Every structure is written in C-alpha cells, then in structure tokens.
Amino acid sequence: MHGNVATIEDIVLDLKPEPFDLYCREQLEDSDAEDETAVTQPDKQAFKVLSQCGGVCCKTVRLCVYSTHTGIRVLQELLHQDALQIVCPTCASRL
C-alpha cells in the first residue's frame, strides 16, 4: 500500500485454486452384511404394558415384556381385539 488510504489497485489478491485429495482412505465394511444382520436380529427393548384383568376383578394389570416393535404392535392388536386377555394372579388362581 502506498499512502494513507488503501485503493482497489493496491489490494492484490492471489487466489489460485489449490487441489486437494477428495478420496477418503477409510475402508467401509460391506453394507450387504449389515443389512442381513439387521433383518435377522431386530432390536429388542423393554416395554411396560398396562391392561385390565380379563377375569372378574377388572383391576389394572402391569406386564413387562422384552420385544421388537413389530412384536409389541401384534400384542397391542390382540389386546384391542379381545383376542388375548391378561389375567391378574388373584383371578388366575380361581381358574
């Protein structure tokens, strides 16, 4: 810069594209193997199920299950359709 104030002519930009390697050296596992394990071993988790006793008392019955999301949906459908009823220990002893 020559003088007290910078002018456009005084500013020199040296912008040259700098090439760099876009390829990653990381090794990826075969994605087909991951897909097969996901299908054969679905993730299970714990669920708390609250339902009314299917016996005489109609008390609230709490059930803890370890299931997949698909399995818990099937259980939910069975309970809603009255195809399956959970019975409390007191009513179960009367059966």
From Swiss-Prot:
It is found in: Host cytoplasm; Host nucleus. GO terms for cellular component: host cell cytoplasm; host cell nucleus. Residues 1-41 are annotated as: E7 terminal domain. This is Protein E7. Homodimer. Homooligomer. Interacts with host RB1; this interaction induces dissociation of RB1-E2F1 complex thereby disrupting RB1 activity. Interacts with host EP300; this interaction represses EP300 transcriptional activity. Interacts with protein E2; this interaction inhibits E7 oncogenic activity. Interacts with host TMEM173/STING; this interaction impairs the ability of TMEM173/STING to sense cytosolic DNA and promote the production of type I interferon (IFN-alpha and IFN-beta). One of its GO terms (biological process) is DNA-templated transcription. Belongs to the papillomaviridae E7 protein family. Highly phosphorylated. It comes from the Viruses. A zinc finger (unnamed) spans 53-91. The gene is E7. Plays a role in viral genome replication by driving entry of quiescent cells into the cell cycle. Stimulation of progression from G1 to S phase allows the virus to efficiently use the cellular DNA replicating machinery to achieve viral genome replication. E7 protein has both transforming and trans-activating activities. Induces the disassembly of the E2F1 transcription factor from RB1, with subsequent transcriptional activation of E2F1-regulated S-phase genes. Interferes with host histone deacetylation mediated by HDAC1 and HDAC2, leading to transcription activation. A motif (LXCXE motif) lies at residues 22-26. Pfam families: E7 (PF00527).
